[in-house]
Amino acid sequence: MRAAAISTPKLDKMPGMFFSANPKELKGTTHSLLDDKMQKRRPKTFGMDMKAYLRSMIPHLESGMKSSKSKDVLSAAEVMQWSQSLEKLLANQTGQNVFGSFLKSEFSEENIEFWLACEDYKKTESDLLPCKAEEIYKAFVHSDAAKQINIDFRTRESTAKKIKAPTPTCFDEAQKVIYTLMEKDSYPRFLKSDIYLNLLNDLQANSLK
């Protein structure tokens, strides 16, 4: 059986997103100690990291607005559509990135990471399903998972049974729980956040130039 790796390539532009290095897997005491120190410092430096990310992101989007020939230009109208539903937000690659940044600021980025991992899993070739299912389960669903998602006991146990004979839909139940959690909890706050409103205001202002 070929080894399978979970891939969410577009999100790797965001700091610390999907499947960042696990200190326990690093070789050598020096690396482990260094990584432990970085983890302890994260709460102090995260705000600065987020601001730096947004500062680098906004000019890029603004410069894209000026090129009418580009088919991938992000418009203010498109960003406004994100407020219509979580479904529309997640259907847009930049929307995924911006929402992921917001979730990271709330230390709940595991929700979108799991949701995206499930979307990727559904497209997996059948012979790779067992490997990938185990990786997703260990990363997000297992009770000792480093990025454990907030699902009820029954859903967790049901998912554990399903991955023993994995199918493309074995994570659907857990994915639905997490989607509903984001939709009712994080998504409304995102629409009122500086991350979203500043991006929208910048694009609207730029469109008037």
UniProtKB/Swiss-Prot annotation:
Q: Which UniProt keywords apply?
A: Cell membrane, Cytoplasm, GTPase activation, Membrane, Signal transduction inhibitor
* One Gene Ontology cellular component annotation held by this UniProt entry: cytosol
| MF terms (GO), sorted A to Z | calmodulin binding; G-protein alpha-subunit binding; GTPase activator activity; GTPase activity
What is the induction note for this entry? In response to several B-cell activation signals.
A Pfam family this chain is assigned to:
RGS
Q: Which residues form a coiled coil?
A: none
Q: Membrane topology per the record? A: Peripheral membrane protein
- Give the CDD domains listed for this entry: RGS_RGS1
Statement: the UniProt record of this protein carries the keyword Glycoprotein = no
Question: Which InterPro entries does this chain map to?
Answer: RGS (IPR016137), RGS_sf (IPR036305), RGS_subdom1/3 (IPR024066), RGS_subdomain_2 (IPR044926)
Task: Kindly list the places in or outside the cell where this protein is found, as annotated in its UniProt entry.
Answer: Cell membrane; Cytoplasm, Cytosol
Q: Which part of the chain is the RGS domain?
A: 85-200
- Swiss-Prot/TrEMBL GO biological process terms: adenylate cyclase-inhibiting G protein-coupled receptor signaling pathway; G protein-coupled receptor signaling pathway; immune response; leukotriene signaling pathway; negative regulation of signal transduction; positive regulation of GTPase activity; response to bacterium; signal transduction
What tissue expression does the UniProt record report for this protein? Detected in peripheral blood monocytes. Expression is relatively low in B-cells and chronic lymphocytic leukemia B-cells; however, in other types of malignant B-cell such as non-Hodgkin lymphoma and hairy cell leukemia, expression is constitutively high.
Summarize subunit and interaction data from the UniProt record for this chain: Interacts with GNAI1 and GNAQ.
**Function, as annotated:** Regulates G protein-coupled receptor signaling cascades, including signaling downstream of the N-formylpeptide chemoattractant receptors and leukotriene receptors. Inhibits B cell chemotaxis toward CXCL12. Inhibits signal transduction by increasing the GTPase activity of G protein alpha subunits thereby driving them into their inactive GDP-bound form.
What name does UniProt use for this protein?
A: Regulator of G-protein signaling 1
Give the organism, scientific name: Homo sapiens (Human)
At the highest ranks, the source species' classification is: Eukaryota, Metazoa, Chordata, Craniata, Vertebrata
Q: Which gene encodes it?
A: RGS1
